[in-house]
Amino acid sequence: MFADINKGDAFGTWVGKSVPRREDADILAGRAEYIADIKLPGMLEAAFLRSPFAHARIVSIDVSQALALPGVYDVMVGADIPDYVKPLPLMITYQNHRETPTSPLARDIVRYAGEPVAVVAAINRYVAEDALELIVVKYEELPVVASIDASLAVDGPRLYEGWPDNVVAKVSSEIGDVDAAMASADLVFEERFEIQRCHPAPLETRGFIAQWDFKGENLNVWNGTQIINQCRDFMSEVLDIPASKIRIRSPRLGGGFGAKFHFYVEEPAIVLLAKRVKAPVRWIEDRLEAFSATVHAREQVIDVKLCAMNDGRITGIVADIKGDLGASHHTMSMGPVWLTSVMMTGVYLIPNARSVAKAIVTNKPPSGSYRGWGQPQANFAVERMVDLLAHKLQLDPAAVRRINYVPEARMPYTGLAHTFDSGRYEVLHDRALKTFGYEAWLERQAAAQAQGRRIGIGMSFYAEVSAHGPSRFLNYVGGRQGGYDIARIRMDTTGDVYVYTGLCDMGQGVTNSLAQIAADALGLNPDDVTVMTGDTALNPYTGWGTGASRSITIGGPAVMRAATRLREKILSIARHWLQADPDTLVLANRGVMVRDDPGRYVSFASIGRAAYCQIIELPEDVEPGLEAVGVFDTVQLAWPYGMNLVAVEVDEDTGAVSFLDCMLVHDMGTIVNPMIVDGQLHGGIAQGIAQALYEELRYDENGQLGTGSFADFLMPTASEIPNMRFDHMVTESPLIPGGMKGVGEGGTIGTPAAVVNAIENALRPITNSKLNRTPVTPDRILTAISAGACA
């Protein structure tokens, strides 16, 4: 815990407090600078021409009219891409996976509607857009594969020449003897779950600026990315530029949710274009481009077979997962499919399990990271199966869950391909039911049903993969680099402190939380700590950047270690000056004092001046300067967990769903900033509700997007989001210094299953139809009511 590291003096003053986010004032006042606000001298604007077809051969491209338009500086097409340019790399590779080479601009074949085929540099965006209309492209349309079923058809079209099928990779995991478990069980049943295609949809779209120096040797990039170091590495590899000559800066991000955790084709394209025109070039993605070119997510079909005994104990599970990667394996598209496959036992002690997952390609934009990665899909399938099991056995779904949890005494516990480090699932379960008022809700439900009202109660329990990730584990599973984090901390001559981290702040408040950690270690106010992010020239290398609930679990301990080392150096100087026993010294009031004699005090400013300027005043064994570096690389993943409980009312005439109660009880370990944590949970639950009820990227059989704007791609607003209740059970992580477990994806994972379980529970008196496809829209609810008479 924090107090142990700091020997109890000022430590714990700030960690655990709701310190207001320091960035909010600038954002609310319109002073915050995003990438669209950056203007460089002589900067040109870029616009991309994108394929209108989902699958076609490029016969010819004529750019002559576009080049003749006043204000146009250049038009670049696939044929202009130099031969030395390499395909975009992957962050994770999987055994026997097939390559899907991706060029900055399509050269011969386009594989999704929205794939870039040309890019224009012009004096402004208006001229660039006008020039796009003057580019003449002749296409030869090819057969389209627009769904998982079509992709897996034996005699269907292949997206890549020479492939025997459309499968990029296949992964599998197995424990126990599934066949024997199925043969000896009292009950065996199976279901198919269809999870829709989603879009992270951050408020700020992507943006990118490339600027070469006057010699054309050094590259400056401003990129709205969550992964500045990986962006530099990828750019170096793709364009054959030494990484030392590339500087990546990520300004303030208006959200990411995983969408900005990828390296996109537009990025090297803009760099090449800027070199051709010998001027800075900026590209700001418009909303239509965001829907058709920024990564999609979630789409899977999961077939589950489960066996159990009559008392509700689950003895085996088999899962067959098919994930739609879109047109290519993009940065880490396979990752969510793999994670779904290894999470198919959930939080339950299921001794026999088999999971097989296929990642397939279709003529849709690439898919990839979105808050929760593959966990919401796995949780939805498993938690829906538990509810259906309870219904078949006429048991309470809460009771069925409780007898199946991995007990605390079995921790650490290894499931399909992961090890839970710890967990008090039964304790949290009991606490959640009591706090939610489960028994009272059951009584209220019975009374409402007697009046013909359709009230339903739903629940789900999840464990979240966090502290991503152990470097050796990542390398073992095919990651191109480790998941450690490095932090550098410096105190200047005034006593102010600067923390440098490779993490990025995309609205989640990480700079606040890191400042609180550093402030506690040094006896400062968080306002005295400036956290510097988003610049490869200033910030240390970090293994994975911001995402996967790793900022506080990996970045936090790195800052803690750096601050503790700086603290030790400060104390060694102060001890020399104050001639005091080290155990009597306290860091407080921007200095060091003797605990029982506060008049004996030396300021940080005095220590800073000595460390940097008056070196003669330092102890002989102390080097000049006040800087320290901290590195943290966990040996194992951390596992926060929680239980979602929801009460809804369904209007059986309209299919409308109203929330009556919405609660999450969770254990994320030590809470650094409760206000920020609650904000993370609010947003995560909202996105979970969106997946359950609203959002869907719908494609027709020709691979054309029918929901390419916020008018059609529905997202819940403040009017649709219910009031939420949270309860925090704190059990410190045994692996992470400080005890943190992570929270960034927690609200998202279990919400869809809880909401759909509640809706189905409400409809049980009038229909036997099952709601196994999301989103559960009003028309699907009405169809379920009309299709299934209650037995």
Swiss-Prot record:
It catalyses: caffeine + a ubiquinone + H2O = 1,3,7-trimethylurate + a ubiquinol; ubiquinone-0 + caffeine + H2O = ubiquinol-0 + 1,3,7-trimethylurate; theobromine + a ubiquinone + H2O = 3,7-dimethylurate + a ubiquinol. InterPro entries: Ald_Oxase/Xan_DH_a/b, Ald_Oxase/Xan_DH_a/b_sf, Ald_Oxase/xanthine_DH-like, AldOxase/xan_DH_MoCoBD1, AldOxase/xan_DH_MoCoBD2, AldOxase/xan_DH_Mopterin-bd_sf. Its cofactor is Mo-molybdopterin cytosine dinucleotide. Binds 1 Mo-molybdopterin cytosine dinucleotide (Mo-MCD) cofactor per subunit. One of its GO terms (molecular function) is iron ion binding. It is an enzyme of class 1 (oxidoreductase). The keyword NAD applies. It comes from the Bacteria. Mo-molybdopterin cytosine dinucleotide binds at residues 257, 371, 548. The caffeine dehydrogenase activity increases linearly from 25 to at least 66 degrees Celsius. An incubation of 30 minutes at 70 degrees Celsius drastically reduces the enzyme activity to 11% of the initial value, and 77% of the activity remains after 30 minutes of incubation at 42 degrees Celsius. Its EC number is 1.17.5.2. Belongs to the xanthine dehydrogenase family. This is Caffeine dehydrogenase subunit alpha. It comes from Pseudomonas sp. (strain CBB1).
